[in-house]
From Swiss-Prot:
Family: Belongs to the PetG family.
GO cellular component, as recorded: cytochrome b6f complex; plasma membrane-derived thylakoid membrane
Main location: membrane
Assembly, per entry: The 4 large subunits of the cytochrome b6-f complex are cytochrome b6, subunit IV (17 kDa polypeptide, PetD), cytochrome f and the Rieske protein, while the 4 small subunits are PetG, PetL, PetM and PetN. The complex functions as a dimer.
Membrane spanning stretches: 5-25
GO MF terms held by the record: electron transporter, transferring electrons within cytochrome b6/f complex of photosystem II activity
Stated name of the protein: Cytochrome b6-f complex subunit 5
InterPro entries to which the protein is assigned, alphabetical: Cyt_6/f_cplx_su5, Cyt_6/f_cplx_su5_sf
Organism: Mastigocladus laminosus
Membrane topology reported for the UniProt record: Single-pass membrane protein
GO biological process: cytochrome complex assembly; photosynthesis
Compartments in which it is found: Cellular thylakoid membrane
Keywords on record: Electron transport, Membrane, Photosynthesis, Thylakoid, Transmembrane, Transmembrane helix, Transport
Name of the gene encoding the protein in the UniProt record: petG
Upper taxonomic lineage: Bacteria, Bacillati, Cyanobacteriota, Cyanophyceae, Nostocales
Amino acid sequence: MVEPLLDGLVLGLVFATLGGLFYAAYQQYKRPNELGG
């Protein structure tokens, strides 16, 4: 069956998206004065 492969692909996409969001938030939190905020 292809279900395990699809599950792995979905989990990979979800973790990649969450990782990107957390990374962007961390970058903005690390340098909050760059945007004048």
